[in-house]
Amino acid sequence: MDPRLSAVRQTCCCFNVRIATTALAIYHVIMSVLLFIEHSVEVAHGKASCKLSQMGYLRIADLISSFLLIAMLFIISLSLLIGVVKNREKYLLPFLSLQVMDYLLCLLTLLGSYIELPAYLKLASRSRASPSKFPLMTLQLLDFCLSILTLCSSYMEVPTYLNFKSMNHMNYLPSQEDMPHNQFIKMMIIFSIAFITVLIFKVYMFKCVWRCYRFIKCMNSVEEKRNSKMLQKVVLPSYEEALSLPSKTPEGGPAPPPYSEV
């Protein structure tokens, strides 16, 4: 193996970086599809913030931008998958940028969460206009699972944009009046531990993608260097150039026969 490739670690915490990055890309592609389906269902069911009858130009623009955001996230995730499969390191850069921005937003959310407890820890029932065919507990469980999957991905801040709310986390944080002070403190401790665990997981994901990027880049550079060292094809000289070349006949040896046309 080339020394440059051996210098780049191909594992991250006992996992191969290419396999881990491929699994991460597939996971985010699936998350993009799930977010698109969920938002489409909310719009189709006439959610309060998405009613077409009460929608002006501003709300139409918000609706279009939300679907464009999901499409952009899908393209970034698909670019990561194609880059790993086809060894194109440049295709990994958009996802790396997304991971950096997501980590900074998660860190700011953690710091702001010490004011009030985030809403996704409280499984409150959603108000629905029509009776649902599914049990309420099942819907709560599915919503909670989707929230956990979104939290562990690089799309944590996406539901905030899709809710058409201003970018202020205090708008959707619950009030401390609904629970006792001791219970609120316990929930804050549990939330902090879980959120720090998620941040560590996000750092691990970034480390896997970064090492995969370095490995693919080194592998491509070694391949280009190897191809450049290949012997180039020698072009035979023309007849006039061959005549102008010095004779290679040894002294005293027989001369070559003269050129004659047939």
Swiss-Prot record:
It is a multi-pass membrane protein. The chain crosses the membrane at residues 19-39, 64-84, 92-112, 134-154, 184-204. This is Lysosomal-associated transmembrane protein 5. Disulfide bonds: none annotated. It is found in: Lysosome membrane. Keywords: Lysosome, Membrane, Phosphoprotein, Transmembrane, Transmembrane helix, Transport. The modification Phosphotyrosine is found at Y259. GO terms for cellular component: cytosol; lysosomal membrane; perinuclear region of cytoplasm; plasma membrane; protein-containing complex; transport vesicle. GO terms for biological process: cellular response to leukemia inhibitory factor; defense response to tumor cell; Golgi to lysosome transport; induction of programmed cell death; intrinsic apoptotic signaling pathway; negative regulation of activated T cell proliferation; negative regulation of autophagic cell death; negative regulation of B cell activation. InterPro entries: LAPTM4/5, LAPTM_4A/5, LAPTM_transporter. One of its GO terms (molecular function) is ubiquitin protein ligase binding. May have a special functional role during embryogenesis and in adult hematopoietic cells. Belongs to the LAPTM4/LAPTM5 transporter family. Its main location: membrane. Binds to ubiquitin.
